[in-house]
């Protein structure tokens, strides 16, 4: 595999990450996929049908030890495409949440993601080429009432990825951030938000979201907001007071809001 094209995808056991991995396999990239659950192995088996080598690494990417395990699995191989997609959500009121759950969201969405970007981004820069895609979110554009921690982490990723892009602009490494809206994955179930309006509303297809992000990355674009409805929502957010956005978000994410229509 030393001389083959290699893509690394985190959070690839389901949802957007799994769809991104499919696109890489379609285009002949050998894959190292990672997630913190055994389902990553089933995902690898399915991807192997595309005729590429797929290695699955089960690792807790919220920890430095888990990220180090992934890096050890990569070894000294050159990474052509890096998809920083692993992430978690958390709904309900901030002060009502167990602190360990809050910390895990921050460590997964920010700490582990940034650590992996630091380690592999440096290798790409020394090599003089590579592409990085962060999965951010349009949630980063608005104060997330009843999703305060999650939206805060995505605001960080949206900002960090664009800053990193401009730091690396002369190295041959491109950085792109994918900003989806609500997508049909296990996100809202895991975040305990199935009694909310946003949790039960119609959502985007993860395959469509992944395709938009993949194409933007391969074209070297700075950012991509997937879906015209999400583009309109972000445009409106830019001219709406933060307090108004926070109240709008409350109506979507407040527990039992699904039963208020």
Task: Give residue spans per PLM region.
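Conserved glycine-rich cofactor-binding loop
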Residues: 13-14
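Conserved glycine-rich Rossmann-like NAD(P)H-binding loop of the short-chain dehydrogenase/reductase
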Residues: 27-42
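The beta1-alpha1 cofactor-binding region of Rossmann-like NAD(H)/NADP(H)-dependent oxidoreductases
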Residues: 58-69, 99
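Substrate-binding pocket helix/loop in short-chain dehydrogenase/reductase
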Residues: 93-106
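Active-site helix of classical SDR
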Residues: 117, 153
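Residue(s) in the substrate-gating loop at a strand-loop-helix junction
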Residues: 137
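C-terminal helical subdomain
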Residues: 177, 197-234
């Amino acid at each position: 595999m030393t001389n083959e094209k290699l893509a690394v995808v985190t959070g690839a056991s389901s949802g957007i990450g799994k769809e991104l991995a499919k696109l890489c396999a379609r285009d002949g990239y050998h894959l190292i996929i990672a997630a913190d659950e055994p389902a990553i192995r089933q995902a690898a088996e399915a991807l192997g049908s595309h005729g590429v080598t797929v290695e699955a690494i089960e690792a807790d990417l919220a920890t430095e030890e888990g990220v180090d395990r992934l890096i050890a699995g990569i070894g000294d191989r050159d990474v052509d495409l890096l998809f920083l997609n692993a992430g978690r959500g958390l709904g309900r009121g901030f002060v009502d949440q167990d602190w360990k759950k809050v910390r895990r969201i921050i460590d997964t969405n920010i700490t582990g993601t940034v650590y992996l970007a630091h380690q592999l981004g440096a290798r790409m820069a020394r090599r003089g080429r590579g592409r990085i895609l962060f999965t951010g979110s349009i949630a980063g554009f608005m104060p997330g009432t009843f999703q305060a921690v999650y939206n805060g982490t995505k605001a960080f990723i949206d900002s960090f990825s664009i800053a990193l892009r401009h730091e690396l602009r002369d190295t041959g490494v491109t950085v792109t951030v994918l900003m989806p809206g609500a997508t049909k994955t296990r996100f809202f179930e895991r975040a305990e938000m199935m009694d909310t309006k946003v949790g039960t509303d119609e959502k985007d297809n993860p395959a469509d979201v992944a395709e938009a992000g993949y194409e933007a990355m391969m074209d070297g674009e700075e950012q991509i907001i997937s879906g015209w409805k999400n583009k309109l929502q972000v445009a409106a957010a830019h001219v709406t007071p933060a307090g108004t956005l926070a109240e709008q978000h409350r109506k979507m994410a407040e527990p039992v809001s699904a039963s208020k229509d």
